[in-house]
Amino acid sequence: MTFFGFLFSLNKVSDQNLKIKTLTIQNSLIFLVCGFIIFTSNPFSRSFPPNVEGSDLNPLLQDPGLAIHPPMLYLGYVGFSIVYSISLAVLILKKKTDFIKILKPWVFISWTFLTAGIGLGSWWAYYELGWGGFWFWDPVENASLLP
């Protein structure tokens, strides 16, 4: 989220109030996520009982496609946070400007990452798990392909 906020701050937006409000909302989202992580996660907690066997990754998950698939999905989901921030800023400021021109590149970038991530995941599931094709998946897996 910080990276997308930084990229938006470099963007030339004609309305400075919109830019300031968007970055304020984006930074508030970052603050909320960081606060949630700080107060709910403890990296020093011990797991009981300790692992008796090795803690290797499942062999099905040891695939080059899965090294790219989750980060692509993450970039897509996080990329939509700046779209949310711009949309909320326009609603708060009650601007009549053509904010679609501002939103369009951010939506396209985020959508591209999501599409690539879902495509990689679908490709991996098709050849690795042998599910027999996309039409034999259950509805949850097919719903990820919907816009």
Regions found by a protein language model. Name each.
Residues 1-147:
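Polytopic transmembrane helical bundles with strong interfacial aromatic enrichment
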